[in-house]
């Protein structure tokens, strides 16, 4: 102390871990904390010792978990919630006119996008990011499970609930942070991982890219160039767009897939009910068998990405085999529920987040592989009018191949209705193709009653979509009676 002036606490300290990571920031508020990506980051920061609060328009499983951990969550948005905060984190679903965002800006509290906060967490660990239009959540979950089985104790932030952990996120003591890299709003450009996988590149979220697929593709290239020159890009060579990327990436590349020229090659795939067996052949001649507790070719590719990443991080083959064989799954990713009791017999029930034609097709193929002799009854809730319009013909083509179909109105996700892109129009297009004859449901409330008159013993029900349909399986678990619904 000189002249009576006390020394200040250092803004940054070394080593930069725990609460020292963010300097003097101690109190962080999350606007829209109930989202899977938001809640996971909030949980990790809470476990690091930060004071976390949040708000959302409604409660839910993520909010309930956080409250159980001691996080204060308010239902509804109010400027008072950000008073005294050092930072405010927002998801892309939160608009600038949100009263908490406006109050934070007026008080000069930093307003931080969710992906930027994830990037800050990643900066002080070895970040491993999984990108791609489809398969991010499953691949990230499989990788986290492999690292955990290999005793690397990873931190992970996942868009789905890892059933074995009962959470979307976990703070580990190990050096690796595994997370999804979200291209839907181009926010993955905030991330600068050490390693990154790209599972596929498909036409989705084109509104973010001005309707230009090439702009989406260029953004993936930009993301991969956020890797350091000594990093690694792990690419699915089976995907034609990812194959195109390979020659434009100025970083070390490792490829995987069923293709003959893959560095990590999948062969000998065999379906066995809900499980799948296959072999992995590596470029140095090493080969080993894998049994995966998930069905479907798409999940084998997801597992191959996780294997390629885990092997590069030093996880031994035995640990990988144990992790994939015992993997308990992720919420809403081919999640198998108890059978639905019927008046006579029962029907199997599977729930999945699939909301893009390519995802629907992969999920249906997996179900047919698991239950080749059984009738598939699909309940599909389209997600967003814009996506339904952009991919209308593909949706109609895939859905017309179902055995029986209940199609609901589009889950708007805040969008205005678009003429010719609603649920009725899609049902009509499916009907015109001459395959499945869809039953249209104006709302999800009608679905249990419709299923009561449709289902028969030994059917397999698939509830599919990214919106509110995720709550339907719980309604069906009590059984169905003709005319009475669930």
UniProtKB/Swiss-Prot annotation:
Disulfide bonds: none annotated. ATP binds at residues 132-138. It holds the Pfam family Mur_ligase. Keywords: ATP-binding, Cell cycle, Cell division, Cell shape, Cell wall biogenesis/degradation, Cytoplasm, Ligase, Nucleotide-binding, Peptidoglycan synthesis. Its EC number is 6.3.2.8. GO terms for biological process: cell division; cell wall organization; peptidoglycan biosynthetic process; regulation of cell shape. It comes from the Bacteria. SUPFAM superfamilies: MurCD N-terminal domain (SSF51984), MurD-like peptide ligases, catalytic domain (SSF53623), MurD-like peptide ligases, peptide-binding domain (SSF53244). GO terms for cellular component: cytoplasm. It is an enzyme of class 6 (ligase). It is found in: Cytoplasm. Belongs to the MurCDEF family. Cell wall formation. This is UDP-N-acetylmuramate--L-alanine ligase. It comes from Halorhodospira halophila (strain DSM 244 / SL1) (Ectothiorhodospira halophila (strain DSM 244 / SL1)).
């Amino acid at each position: 102390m000189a002249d009576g002036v006390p020394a200040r606490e250092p803004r940054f300290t070394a080593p930069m871990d725990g609460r020292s990571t963010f300097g003097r920031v101690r109190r962080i508020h999350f606007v829209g904390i109930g989202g899977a990506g938001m809640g996971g980051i909030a949980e990790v920061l809470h476990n690091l010792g930060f004071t976390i609060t949040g708000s959302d328009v409604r409660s839910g499983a993520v909010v309930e978990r956080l409250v159980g951990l001691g996080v204060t969550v308010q239902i509804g948005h109010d400027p008072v919630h950000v008073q005294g905060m050092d930072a405010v984190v927002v998801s892309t679903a939160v608009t600038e006119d949100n009263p908490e965002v406006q109050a934070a800006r007026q008080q000069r509290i930093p307003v931080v996008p969710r992906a930027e906060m994830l990037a800050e967490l990643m900066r002080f660990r070895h970040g491993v990011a999984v990108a791609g239009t489809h398969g991010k959540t499953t691949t990230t979950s499989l990788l986290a499970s492999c690292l955990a089985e290999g005793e690397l104790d990873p931190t992970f932030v996942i868009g789905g609930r890892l059933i074995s952990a009962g959470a979307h996120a976990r703070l580990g003591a190990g050096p690796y942070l595994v997370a999804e890299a979200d291209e839907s709003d181009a926010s993955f450009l905030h991330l600068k991982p050490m390693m990154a996988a790209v599972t596929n590149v498909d036409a989705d979220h084109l509104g973010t890219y001005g309707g230009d697929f090439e702009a989406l593709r260029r953004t993936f290239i930009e993301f991969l160039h956020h890797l350091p020159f000594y990093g690694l890009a792990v690419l699915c060579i089976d995907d034609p767009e990812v194959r195109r990327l390979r020659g434009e990436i100025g970083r070390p590349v490792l490829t995987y897939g069923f293709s003959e020229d893959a560095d990590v090659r999948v062969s000998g795939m065999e379906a066995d009910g809900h499980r799948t067996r296959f072999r992995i052949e590596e470029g140095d001649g090493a080969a080993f068998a894998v049994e995966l507790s998930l069905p479907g070719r798409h999940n084998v590719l997801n597992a191959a990405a996780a294997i390629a990443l885990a092997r590069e991080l030093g996880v031994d083959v035995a640990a990988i085999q144990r992790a994939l064989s015992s993997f308990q799954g992720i919420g809403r990713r081919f999640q198998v529920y108890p059978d639905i009791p019927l008046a006579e017999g029962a029907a199997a029930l599977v729930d999945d987040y699939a909301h893009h034609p390519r995802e629907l097709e992969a999920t249906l193929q997996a179900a047919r592989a698991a239950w080749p002799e059984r009738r598939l009854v699909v309940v599909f809730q389209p997600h967003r009018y814009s996506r339904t319009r952009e991919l209308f013909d593909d949706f109609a083509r895939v859905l017309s191949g179902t055995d029986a179909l209940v199609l609901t109105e589009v889950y708007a996700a805040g969008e205005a209705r678009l003429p010719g892109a609603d649920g009725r129009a899609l049902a009509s297009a499916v009907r015109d193709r001459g395959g499945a004859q869809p039953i249209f449901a104006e709302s999800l409330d009608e679905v249990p009653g419709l299923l009561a008159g449709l289902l028969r013993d030994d059917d397999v029900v698939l509830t599919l979509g990214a919106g509110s349909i995720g709550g339907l399986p719980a309604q069906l678990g009590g059984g169905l009676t003709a005319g009475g619904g669930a």
